[in-house]
Each structure stands twice: as C-alpha cells, then as structure tokens.
Amino acid sequence: MQDERPLNLSVSIVCFNSSGIELRALISSLVTTVEKLRASYVVAQLPVFLIDNSENPQLSLEVFADFSGRLHAQEIELRLVQGHGNVGYGKGHNLILNRIESRYHLILNPDIQLDEDCLTEGITHLESNGDVVLASPFAQYENGVKQHLCKTYPSVLTFFVRGFLPQGLRALFSKRIAKYEMHGLTDRDASTDIPIVSGCFMLCLSDALIRAKGFDEAYFLYFEDFDLSLRMGEFGRLDYVPAMRIEHAGGHAARKGFSHLRMFMQSGFRFFNTHGWRFFRQAG
C-alpha cells in the first residue's frame, strides 16, 4: 500500500443514446482500473453517475447486471440520472455537481476505455502535486493512432484549417496544427501548465471544479471543455500525465453534418467572445 488514508473519488458519465455495448466496455474498464487503484490506496465507496441525456431514455442498470458482482466487490455504486432530456454535455455533468463529496472527480465521455493503471497513475500524480487541479491522459484511437487532447489557446485560422480544408491543403499548415495540438509533449513524463485539455477525460480536484462552478451551461456542445480548462487554470495547474492511458473513439464536429457544424460555430463564437479573439496568431 502506498497510503492508508481513505481516498474519495467520484465519476460522472454523460451519454446520449449510447449503446449498451459501449457503456459496458467503459464500466468494465473502470472496474478494472479501480481494482488496481485499490492495490495502492484505501478507496472509499465510489459513486458513478450515469447521466442519460436521451429524450426518450431507455438506459437501465440491468445492462450491467452480469458483472454486478465485480461492481460490488470494488464498492462501485452506479447511479442513473435521467428524465431531464438533452440538456447538453456540460449541463449534464453539472446536474450532479452539488452531489460531489469526493476529493477527486472524473469527468468522462461514454466512448472511453481506461487502461488498468489509468487511475492509479492519475491519482498518484495528483496526490504528489498539490497545486494540480486537473490531469489529462494519453489517448489513442482503436487503431492505435495517438490523439492530442492537450491544446494551446486557439486561433480562428487554426480551427478553419483543421475543420474545413482538404487533407492536401491542411498539410501546408502542419506546423501550425502541431503547435496548437502540442505535438512536442513527451509521452514519457508528465508535462505541466497545459492551457486547455479535452473534456472526454478530466480527472479533477473536486474543490477546484466546484469553485469554477462546473461547465458553463451556455455551451450546449463543443468548447465547454476549453472554457472549463481556462477557468480551472485560475485555481492551479493543468497537467498532461501520459502514464494515464485511455482509448477514445472520438470524432470531429466538422465531419458530423450541418447541425453539429452550427453548434460548433455558435460555441466557438461564445468562447472567443468570452476569452478573447485570435484570428491568426497561434499561442504557444
């Protein structure tokens, strides 16, 4: 055991018409990583809030019935929150903000699978670095291609290049994109003072998350994680911890049709209005 102090952790997952297969894979991986965490820490009962944003919710905890024994053994309590409709990703997570009693809170997408050492590595980093309020993991697609979850402050030009230019033209801006996506980060050691991280996986110091008042609910989808990253950064460091590893299905707004593109542009407009416009100059 590294530490005999009880460690409190909670998890929230916002889903929208998510498949049972996808959610089972996530919860199964969560059980495995919690089991490894318990080998290093005394972990209190762990609430996992499944927040179902579906307009006609069909999700039932019966989906997980066949590994209820594993959940019980690791003292993981699934709590289903539904009936509120599609309120958006950020507001969905905020629905349980006033129910968080843990020292650490993990925000997750449903299309995630966690490596077995993921939580042990993340919690150890946070326990060892008291000024860190949020940790972001190494992520890859199912095919093993790396995702870049850490970002510098964006410019409008960079978003246009990444989202709308064909691959051939996008290659002309490879240095700009690499700078924005922080390709220079090492995957061996933790990197500190990251400006912005993806909302698909945010391991947060709960106190800082609550002080930041969670997500800005004016963002229905997209940029809510950028905004929260910057506001969380007012209370401490955001670190990239590559020893935390996940698999993430992911997706790009500009490739999901007009409705997603419209939401992306509306949220982007709000983000830049709030935090400052940069049309061409790329931070970093």
Question: Each PLM stretch: what is its role?
Answer:
Residues 18-40:
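Short, well-formed alpha-helical segments that are part of the catalytic scaffolds
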Residues 49-63:
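A conserved acidic beta->alpha catalytic loop
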Residues 82-100:
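Glycine-rich, basic loop-to-helix element that forms the pyrophosphate-binding segment
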Residues 116-149:
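Conserved donor NDP-sugar-binding/catalytic core segment of glycosyltransferases
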Residues 186-245:
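A short, conserved alpha-helix in the catalytic core of glycosyltransferases
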